[in-house]
Amino acid sequence: MNSSLNLTSNLIFLFFLPLLLWSQPQYTISTNNGAHPGNLFFHVGGQPPRTVNIMDSTGSLIHSEPFGLKGWAWKVNLNNKITYFDRQSKGWFVMDSLENVVDTVYCQNEYIADNHDFLALENGNYILFAYDEQPYATDTISPEGSPDETVTGLVIQELDSDHNVIFEWQSWDHYYMSDYPDINYSSNGIDFLHCNAIDIDEDGHFLISNRNISEITKIHRTTGEIIWRFGGAQSDFTFLNDYPFSQQHCIKSLGNNRYLLFDNGNQSDLYTGGIKRSRGVEYELNLSDYTATKTWDYVHPDSLFTPSIGSIQRLDNGNTLINFGNNQNINRGSVITEVTETNEVVFELEMDNGQNIYCANKAEWNFYSEPVVELNELNQQKKTQLTIYPNPSNSTFFVELKNQNETFRKIEIFNINGDVILSIPFLEQSTINIFPINEKLSTGIYILKATSNEHSYYSRICISD
């Protein structure tokens, strides 16, 4: 709820959420002091039960639910709705704050959506991608190649709200395997373009993270031309004060030519004296001389090396949330760390060994639960004294105070985001205790707050077609 639903301090909000204790993730919180106030969203992979979770700023789980093959990349997306991937149907699910699945999004043109990343935009469009396996005579490139190899490319699609393709990009038009000398041509199947993240830069063009070639690529959103490449064998940029990132995840545009990513660091030992380590890192790119300057990084005090998965998020208070996703090489679960701009740790959570998290994100968002309001114990007993009828309604409905000694002082109606959409004040000397609402409301669920001369009450009103 936003500030428009700023209830008095003695209101009690009871959240009726499916906390299934037997399936909750197992973790330890070692630090929680001054962290960002948003809720933490994460999906636990590995062995069942695979839960989707929301944790509040105190470290308490307020939502934990086993999702089976669903739930991958569980997060609040750009359209202010939860999105997650279903590994069985190969589609992205979009869920509103009432826990209704309001859309399911699949790749078009016979491509199969990949589970790594997905953008649901404010304008209703969707951006997703697919891996595209094609036969390739790699013996024409390398003596270790095969005349009938299978090579994985990439297809990016932008769909409108009706799932029509308005942009499609194919990597085969822009990438050449011969440009990348580190490809292992003796492997059975070559995962050439292993895209694991997509973002939109401040100028509207796409950013993608290609893990296996250690490259961040910027792609023109209408022409499909590659604008620049950062990292890897074909990098347009020279690193000034840092070693190259490798096998990275989670590219994020910060604006002003600054970019944030999770550097898995699979090749970091070549630059750190033989020690592999993962980190969060931020760069500023100079588009005049094509140089890259490291402006921030964070290496965990335990020098965690996360060979796969991981994520990073810059929060609106300047803190950075880092998910060291796969620590099975040292028999540890995922480690989620939040640090300030000066790298002070203000939050750290570690999952039990075997429980891995692909991505972790914070947002000031939660599923809607109808609040039960009590100003005192007597008011709690009297909350049935408010009646709304008919409910559901498709036209005029009535609000009635059952206690004849109570009269209205104010009636307010809120949408599920907590925005006031109707406010009706009454005179102090009003004797009205039944009142018709004639306002035409859109179909949906609303919260009605009735303030009387004695109490405040809340109830749900459903507007039907």
Regions found by a protein language model. Give the residues of each.
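Intrinsically disordered, low-complexity Ser/Thr/Pro-rich tracts
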Residues: N2-S9, P66, I226, F408
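Bacterial Sec-dependent N-terminal signal peptides
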Residues: M1-P25, L375, D465
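Histidine-/acidic-rich catalytic cores in large beta-rich domains
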Residues: Q24-V373
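C-terminal outer-membrane/trafficking sorting elements
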Residues: D56-S57, N379-Y389, S393-D465
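Generic marker of residues within folded, mature protein domains
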Residues: F13-F15, Q108, S146, N188, ...
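A generic structural signal for short, non-catalytic loop/turn and secondary-structure boundary residues
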Residues: F16, A35, T291, Q381-K382
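Residue-level detector of functionally pivotal "anchor" positions at catalytic/ligand-binding pockets or at interdomain
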Residues: Q24-Y27, E364-Y389, K402-Q404
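Compositionally biased, intrinsically disordered/low-complexity regions enriched for serine, proline
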Residues: F15, W22, G34, Y298, ...
